[in-house]
């Protein structure tokens, strides 16, 4: 028991800064939406449309780079800190390649926007402008993530917290300047949000780079600086570890995007209720997500130390902590669902719909916590391919089809509307949680030599 309590304290020390960093990053999008909405409804809608293209593309790139965290954690735990600098440099090469490809995809996003907004040329023009401004922040964002993954892999989560919070604070005045055209800048409206956010990503990257160049605890890593040229063996390994993570993120993001489109014909009340419930549950999701990041670090570090038993304790502690948090957030959501919905909208019909869906959200929070922390555990074991297969089956083979049948057909029960899709979320996330735990148990029963060999790849 003492081992679990000690591990829980270490996990908490890592997870709390990650929570603050994640909230800061999420809040930047909220700030963009609110400030664009204060300028005009069209600009707010343009930011929302542009973000719907931006988010899947940038999260895919982000997912590819997440492989660096367990790699650094394992090297740090095994005492091979002299090799970390080389892995980070290769991640910069990977980030540069991803940046170019992501920018090209986002630039072509205007075709999707024109299809989505064919009845409103003004909205389409503003959304395209926002996206084209924001795409220049892609390299800054991805380079920042490389440095953040390096710090987190070394069990230092405070730099990401502090710089993420600074980024949120400076995003507000820069937004104001470019939206309203202050201090000699052009008045860009919603497009100004894209300019501001892209600028903030570069500022965050420069601050993180300055920090990593000055931090005393990184001095020994800075001393080992191999030639700055691509190592295709390392690049291939990082890409191979990161691709399943990126695809899993893409599956999740596109699942919610597809459901939003399927709910759209069901009317304003259903759409508004769905969005309120989804927005709030996404905020609650930050807690287990952050525990999952911390669990990746702890499992990777323990495996680097050569301790399979301690890695198992770290994994179990992370999952138990996530379940405990999920129970608290589920109770909170259940008891306060109506007051929370009223914060978003005063329409009684919208509040009633949102409250109903938030009750379903409370049901799946435990499954959601187990699956996202399970993902973190598997990343720590460098078993990322299973993450890809599990998320694909859970979300697209089980979750979405069952949700569609329940929501829009009479095949199983009379049409449930949006609640049917949320029942599909419950089915998909529960299936993912069960498969994650099953896979983790399978890995942990393997011979120690095999587990450590996989971790050392």
Swiss-Prot record:
GO CC terms of this entry: plasma membrane
Annotated TM spans: 11-31, 53-73, 93-113, 127-147, 159-179, 190-210, 249-269, 276-296, 313-333, 357-377, 387-407, 417-437
Keyword Hydrolase (UniProt): no
Superkingdom of this protein's organism: Bacteria
Bilayer topology annotation: Multi-pass membrane protein
Molecular functions (GO terms): antiporter activity; xenobiotic transmembrane transporter activity
Presence of keyword Magnesium: no
Keywords for the protein's UniProt record, in alphabetical order: Antiport, Cell inner membrane, Cell membrane, Ion transport, Membrane, Sodium, Sodium transport, Transmembrane, Transmembrane helix, Transport
Subcellular location field: Cell inner membrane
Location, primary (coarse class): membrane
GO biological process: sodium ion transport; xenobiotic transmembrane transport
Function: Multidrug efflux pump that functions probably as a Na(+)/drug antiporter.
HAMAP family, alphabetized: MdtK
Protein family membership: Belongs to the multi antimicrobial extrusion (MATE) (TC 2.A.66.1) family. MdtK subfamily.
NCBIfam families: matE
Protein name: Multidrug resistance protein MdtK
Organism: Pectobacterium atrosepticum (strain SCRI 1043 / ATCC BAA-672) (Erwinia carotovora subsp. atroseptica)
């Amino acid at each position: 028991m003492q081992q679990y309590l000690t591990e829980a304290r270490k996990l908490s020390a890592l997870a709390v800064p990650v929570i603050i960093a994640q909230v800061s990053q999420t809040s930047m999008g909220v700030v963009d939406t609110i400030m664009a909405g204060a300028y005009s409804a069209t600009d707010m809608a343009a930011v929302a449309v542009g973000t719907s293209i931006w988010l899947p593309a940038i999260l895919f790139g982000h997912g590819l780079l997440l492989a660096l965290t367990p790699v650094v954690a394992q090297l740090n735990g095994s005492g091979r800190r002299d090799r970390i600098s080389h892995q980070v440099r290769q991640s910069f090469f990977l980030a540069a390649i991803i940046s170019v490809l992501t920018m090209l995809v986002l630039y072509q996003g205007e075709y999707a926007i024109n299809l989505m907004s064919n009845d409103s040329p003004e909205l389409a023009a503003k959304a395209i402008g926002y996206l084209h401004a924001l795409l220049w922040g892609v390299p800054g964002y991805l380079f920042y993530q490389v440095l953040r993954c390096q710090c987190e892999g070394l069990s230092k989560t405070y730099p990401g917290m502090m710089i993420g919070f600074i980024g949120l604070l400076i995003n507000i005045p820069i937004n104001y300047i470019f939206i309203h055209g202050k201090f000699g800048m052009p008045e860009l409206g919603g497009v100004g949000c894209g300019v501001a956010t892209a600028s903030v990503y570069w500022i965050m990257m420069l601050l993180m780079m300055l920090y990593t160049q000055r931090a005393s605890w990184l001095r020994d890593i800075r001393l080992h600086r191999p030639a700055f040229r691509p190592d295709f063996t390392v690049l291939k390994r990082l890409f191979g570890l990161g691709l399943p993570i990126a695809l899993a993120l893409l599956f999740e993001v596109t699942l919610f995007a597809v459901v939003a489109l399927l709910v759209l014909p069901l009317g304003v009340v259903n759409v508004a209720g769905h969005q309120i419930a989804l927005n709030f549950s996404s905020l609650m999701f930050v807690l287990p997500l952050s525990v999952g990041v911390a669990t990746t670090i702890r499992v990777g570090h323990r495996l680097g130390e050569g301790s399979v038993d301690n890695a198992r304790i770290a994994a179990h502690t992370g999952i138990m902590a996530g379940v405990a948090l999920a129970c608290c957030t589920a109770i909170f959501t259940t008891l306060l669902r109506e007051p929370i919905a009223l914060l978003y909208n005063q329409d009684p019909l919208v509040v009633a719909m949102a409250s109903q869906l938030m009750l379903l959200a409370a049901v799946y929070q435990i499954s959601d916590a187990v699956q996202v922390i399970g993902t973190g555990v598997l990343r720590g074991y460098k078993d990322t391919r299973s993450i890809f297969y599990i998320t694909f089956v859970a979300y697209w083979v089980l979750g979405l089809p069952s949700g569609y049948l329940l929501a829009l057909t009479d095949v199983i029960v009379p049409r449930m509307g949006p609640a049917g899709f949320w029942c599909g979320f419950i089915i998909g996330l529960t299936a993912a949680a069960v498969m994650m735990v099953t896979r983790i148990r399978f890995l942990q029963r393997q011979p120690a030599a095999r587990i450590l060999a996989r971790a050392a790849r």
